[in-house]
A protein has these predicted regions:
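C-terminal active-site rim and adjoining tail of enzyme catalytic domains
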Residues: 19-22, 98-181
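Metal-dependent phosphodiesterase/phospholipase catalytic core, i.e.
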Residues: 1-103, 118-131, 140-142
Length: 181
């Protein structure tokens, strides 16, 4: 995977947000950890499995964290339950959150509560399109932290409404609107 980094570093990581050319590159994981450590920032590490390399990805991330001796708080989140379970075996004392984009026939709200309980996940992150008062009540009764994300950034107004209903955290790609909250 490191073999391709020199090519990835050439990509303009800021263009998506700023709609113009920037000098923002895709940082290495170690660079992110160093920045977080220097600024005393905790981090959510989203496990995004590379098909066919899920185990290698998880092992590599755990190795970097251990080698770096990252001392800030962190937790792992993923839509991929298998990746979370693999990482939990390697780093059993870390915190974990299961991300849910939609309810399906093979995975219900009760299944999600059972999974969080079985694997001692501290958090469940829901797509804002599927979150409602009933989901929030059910999850809170399970003593699991609720986070919400959206394909588009949540507005401050949407976030305030979610927080008032019991959601504890939101994910955002661009937090500048939230600077003064």
């Amino acid at each position: 995977i490191d073999y391709f980094y020199k090519d990835l570093k050439k990509l303009d990581a800021g263009h998506f947000f700023y709609k113009k050319s920037t000098n923002i590159y895709i940082p290495k994981f170690e660079e992110i950890l160093l920045l977080c450590q220097n600024k005393n920032i905790n981090i959510n590490i989203e496990l995004k499995p590379n098909k066919g390399f899920e185990k290698e990805s998880v092992v590599s991330i755990a190795k970097v964290l251990n080698d770096f001796q990252f001392s800030n708080e962190f937790y792992f989140s993923s839509f991929d339950l298998d990746s979370l379970i693999m990482m939990k075996k390697i780093l059993p004392n870390a915190n974990y959150g299961f991300l849910i984009d939609e309810f399906k026939r093979n995975i219900t709200l009760n299944d999600i509560k059972d999974i969080a309980n079985k694997y001692n996940f501290i958090c469940c992150g829901f797509n804002k399109d599927i979150i409602n008062s009933d989901v929030i009540t059910e999850i809170l009764q399970s003593n699991v932290i609720i986070t919400v994300y959206s394909k588009e950034n949540l507005t401050v107004s949407e976030s305030n409404e979610l927080w008032s209903k019991g959601v504890q955290s939101i994910f955002t790609d661009d937090p500048k609107e939230f600077k003064f909250i």
